[in-house]
Amino acid sequence: WYAHKVWLHEYPMKYRNSPFFTHIAHHKRSRLNQFHDEGYAESMFKNAEIYNEKTALIALAAGSTILLPVAPFFTAGLYYGIYNYWKVHAKSHLDPEYARKRIPWHYDHHMTSDQNANWCITRPWFDYIMETRVFTDISIPETNPLGYDLPVWLEKRVNKIAKRILPKAYAKIEAASQQDQEQLRQGIEVPLS
């Protein structure tokens, strides 16, 4: 969440010569192509944005390897998270319908009027905690803040607990979602920050 928001959005918008500025180009391509970004089908050696993204992920994995002897399960979890992020993110931009149905929070990140929301990629729960989830009518929204398909009885409990723990977050999310819908109707696009 933090890395996406700060390193890939805020920093490159302030410093256009940042290697992460290629992420802004990714946003533009996704927006112009109804979420599709063909760059994810290319070799990392032929596409600067893919090169930067994969290099950062490889560096994160390599850098965390030092923790392996003292925190093997944490390190394995980090490796899995990096792999899962790449797999889900790449697949979603090559198959927009998959993204719209399976990771609607990320689809909404690119396709809403304000791309400065919905920072999570693989699961939306942190967007709920940080009050940055915005729902749209253009995706099929998740039915619980974990973003998992849960049995109905469990989903009801998860939603009830989440709304009890995060009432202000849910109110803010609802207000932001309504504002975004109005901006979409008016054709307003908020610039990336």
Where are these predicted regions, by residue range?
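A membrane-cytosol interface segment of integral membrane proteins
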Residues: 155-191
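Membrane-embedded catalytic scaffold of the fatty acid hydroxylase/desaturase
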Residues: 1-166
